Amino acid sequence: MNVDEEIQKLEEEIHRLGSRQTDGSYKVTFGVLFNDDRCANIFEALVGTLRAAKKRKIVAFEGELLLQGVHDKVEITLRPTPPPPQAAAATAASS
């Protein structure tokens, strides 16, 4: 699995384990992700996948490196997905 595939899987798992916020984002704590059996089986290096997703501005969390136990309560936010360009153009045209 390459980095893009791992980030896509991470998004799916945050949707599954997290809670939807009013702005369309999803939040989950690092501890919930790290201790989930399904995530443990999918991600060989969860922290590395999180860092790659943060670098691409797909997720946000405080700090650079998350460690089990120490950072279990750190919230990870999956940013809302912007609408596809066609939908955005249609919305702008109807305004």
UniProtKB/Swiss-Prot annotation:
Keywords assigned by UniProt, alphabetized: Acetylation
Annotated signal sequence range: none
Source species, domain of life: Eukaryota
Pfam family, one: Costars
GO terms for cellular component: cytosol
InterPro entries attached to this UniProt entry: Costars (IPR044302), Costars_dom (IPR027817), Costars_sf (IPR038095)
N-acetylmethionine sites (modified residues): M1
Family named by the database record: Belongs to the costars family.
PANTHER family according to UniProt: COSTARS FAMILY PROTEIN ABRACL, COSTARS FAMILY PROTEIN-LIKE
Name of the protein: Costars family protein At4g33640
Organism: Arabidopsis thaliana
